[in-house]
Amino acid sequence: MKFSLIAAVALLALAQGSFAQDAADLEKITQYFENLKNKMTEDVTAFLTNQDVANQAQTFMQERKTQLEPLATQIQEQLRAAATKFEEHITPLAANVQPVVENFQQQMEALVQKLMEKTRSISN
């Protein structure tokens, strides 16, 4: 009978230890799910915050584009006018400079021709 009592006490002790281990495991699992819930909440909040920033940036860009389009059109018109005026001034200047350039080219060709003749006469 003593042996039966000792075996029963040992069995109860093992069962109690097993339940204690299960309780510790249950606590770990509960803590894991709590951490997972907190992490998911943080991630979703960060995602939604980033989406809000992206939407704000998109809205900002659209507003600035709307503001800058008239300015860009105005600058293009001014550049066209400046190009027209520049062309009006350059065309007569180019016409005046062309004879000078042609004269210079003829003088340089004559000089090169003389140098070639001198080189030939020296080499012979």
UniProtKB/Swiss-Prot annotation:
Taxonomic lineage from the root: Eukaryota, Metazoa, Chordata, Craniata, Vertebrata
The subcellular location is: Secreted
Q: Which UniProt keywords apply?
A: Antifreeze protein, Pyrrolidone carboxylic acid, Secreted, Signal
Described purpose of this protein according to its UniProt entry: Antifreeze proteins lower the blood freezing point.
In Swiss-Prot or TrEMBL terms, this protein is called: Type-4 ice-structuring protein
What species does this protein belong to?
Paralichthys olivaceus
Q: Does the keyword Zinc apply?
A: no
Pyrrolidone carboxylic acid sites (modified residues)? 21
Family membership, please give it. Answer: Belongs to the apolipoprotein A1/A4/E family.
Q: According to the UniProt entry, where is the signal peptide?
A: 1-20
One GO location term (cellular component):
extracellular region
